[in-house]
Amino acid sequence: MAKEELIELQGVVDEVLPDSRYRVTLDNGVAVGAYASGRIRKHRIRILAGDRVTLEMSPYDLTKGRINFRHKDERPSSAPANRNFVRR
């Protein structure tokens, strides 16, 4: 029996829950529960409320998803970018 294809969707993180779980609203308006994938946890990629993410969902359970990518912000960050550090 072949493995079913995963559905890939995009959404915005609404709420950060305990145990690296998140409440995400998809682009179509549906709210789902999601967890961070192992790769995201391994590399300690921080996901905050308001972040745009890509989820994978199983066609059998459309209430849960796995976050496998956090999109970079289009807005500039508040921290200065590489100020030509000089070692003394």
From Swiss-Prot:
Gene3D superfamilies, per the entry: Nucleic acid-binding proteins (2.40.50.140)
A Gene Ontology cellular-component term: cytosol
Keywords from the named record: Cytoplasm, Initiation factor, Protein biosynthesis, RNA-binding, rRNA-binding
InterPro entries documented for this protein: NA-bd_OB-fold, RNA-binding_domain_S1_IF1, TIF_IF1
An MF annotation (GO) of this entry: translation initiation factor activity
Entry keyword annotation includes Plastid: no
Keyword rRNA-binding: yes
Start and end residues of each S1-like domain: 1-72
Pfam families: eIF-1a
Subcellular location, record wording: Cytoplasm
Subunit annotation: Component of the 30S ribosomal translation pre-initiation complex which assembles on the 30S ribosome in the order IF-2 and IF-3, IF-1 and N-formylmethionyl-tRNA(fMet); mRNA recruitment can occur at any time during PIC assembly.
Family membership: Belongs to the IF-1 family.
NCBIfam families per UniProt: infA (TIGR00008)
Biological function: One of the essential components for the initiation of protein synthesis. Stabilizes the binding of IF-2 and IF-3 on the 30S subunit to which N-formylmethionyl-tRNA(fMet) subsequently binds. Helps modulate mRNA selection, yielding the 30S pre-initiation complex (PIC). Upon addition of the 50S ribosomal subunit IF-1, IF-2 and IF-3 are released leaving the mature 70S translation initiation complex.
Protein's recorded name: Translation initiation factor IF-1 2
